[in-house]
Every structure is written in structure tokens, then in C-alpha cells.
Amino acid sequence: MQNIFKLSCLVLAVVLSSAAWAQIAVKVDGGWARATVQGQKATGAFMKLTAPQATRLVAVSTPVAGVAEIHEMKMDGNVMKMRAIAGLDLPANQAVELKPGSYHLMLMDLKAPLMKDSSVALTLTFKDAKGVETKQQVSVPVNTGMPQAAGHQHADHKH
């Protein structure tokens, strides 16, 4: 009887640790959203995502916009085109950068201007290889342009 109890505890521990592994958050670095002006109805949000295991970014939502989508910018002949994509693969332990002119989050039908030095709450939805979806809340600052990396400020350079 004692062996059955020990085995049950071991099985429960394995199941719980597997569930905890599935809930490990995707690392979000350098997130920001581009500030807008009165009347502007869309903007982009950018960040670097690193997943501890292969997953896919499948959706984004935010209270500041009526529509939020995952987009990519891509050359089509000599023309740069932007389009919504169904999802973005995040390979295990490889940073995927969402940046201007590339993959990004498009926030459309803005409910109010995004002011510099404010922040935007985003809910990122990921789906793993087993089809399990997890949601992750992030807050990103609003800036007028891409923030400079620490130690790489160029504002004072004269060219």
C-alpha cells in the first residue's frame, strides 16, 4: 500500500512539473509602442521575444485599440508591403525581433492617441506544439522612436 502511495505521489509530481513547464513565460525584451498624434488611428508595437521551448505567437489584444494583429513587412518586387499573418513561430531559445520594417504588432482603430512616456498593456497569446494556448500580459512604454540600447546613445554625435 505504501508503494502505491509513493508511486501516486511521483506521478502527481511529474504531472505538476510538466504543467509548470508548459506555463514558462516567453521572455519579452526592449518592448515599446510608437507614439501617435491626434487623429492617427494606427501604430506599431515592437519587442524581442525569446521562448524557452518552441511556440507560436498567435494573437495579440489590447484595451487601447479596437483591432490588434501580428504583421510582417516584406519586399514584393520593388515595393515594401505590410500584411497580417496568422502567427509567428518562436524557435526554442532563439530571440525573434519584432521591429519597424519587419515583424511587428499592429494596433489599429486606436481609441485615443498614445502619448510619449505613457504605457500600453498588451496580451500576447502563444500556442505550443500540443495546441495548448497561454496568455501573457505585458506592458510596453510609448516612445517616439526606437529606444537606444544602453551605452549606445548617439544624440550628441555630430556628422
Task: State what each model feature region is.
Residues S18-A22:
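Sec/Tat signal peptide C-region and signal peptidase I cleavage site
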Residues I24-H159:
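Compact, glycine-rich, soluble single-domain proteins
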Residues L10-V11, Q23-A25:
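Short, composition-biased local secondary-structure segments
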Residues L12-S17:
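Hydrophobic core
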Residues M1-C9:
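Bacterial N-terminal signal peptides that target proteins for export
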